[in-house]
Amino acid sequence: VGHSVEHYYLDDYAMVNLEGHKGDKVTIELIGAFLPEVVVEGLYAATDKTGLKVKSMTLEPIAAMNVIIPPEIRLINIALVDIGAGTSDIAIARDGAIVAYAMATVAGDEISEDIVRKFFVDFNMAESMKIQASGGTDSITYRDIFGREQTISKADFFEKCSPSVDSLADVISQAVCDANGQSPAAMFLIGGGSMANGLADALADKLGIDHGRVAVGGQEFMKNVDVGDRKLGPEYVTPVGIAVTACTNMAYD
């Protein structure tokens, strides 16, 4: 479903781009990304039911990389982590190329499930509480499973959620180190789960890197993309990346 070229060689000499050059032997080192056939068939079945057709397919970290960490800044050892609901997808850039992909099977739902248990609410209410927590008010109002309306301050809410945020940071930081071989020099967090309060700082602490080098990426970090006057948060990076990847013929048919 996708690939990333690490190095091109022409007659055993490293090249940035082979186009327009002549030689006797071409060598390409790349990382290929594969999905089980049943997963791909399931994706096609879902789109068929909506009356849509698949134009192209790619891997989410590849798509996000294309707009957040383009080739000109991949000399830096950067980790990109797309924290969704059920999984956290990881891509590692180093020495001018994308060198590794990984996935942690924990993400934003871990925090939602912790909220369910601690506040006696259903899952949808837990999601609503997370959304309220990212807003401008100082308190969060919710209705528990007994039908009682409750109010809690943001400070108390964040304190009660901090163990699950810390646990999520543990798993992600370990997966990043396993993929990279060590802590990266910097990290971009994208996806809805990346907005969890305190997650960026927790990851910086666990990886031993400066807090200023772990950023939650949104519109301001998108390269070579004009989204007009729209204010796009980190949850939009991957969808925009998928569109860019498809339009620039970097995806798979």
Q: Model-found features: residue ranges?
A:
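Glycine-rich phosphate-binding/hydrolytic loop that grips phosphoryl groups
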Residues: 215-253
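Active-site lining segments that contact anionic ligands and/or coordinate catalytic metals
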Residues: 87, 182-186, 234-239
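Generic beta-strand/beta-sheet core signal
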Residues: 60, 83, 93, 190-192, ...
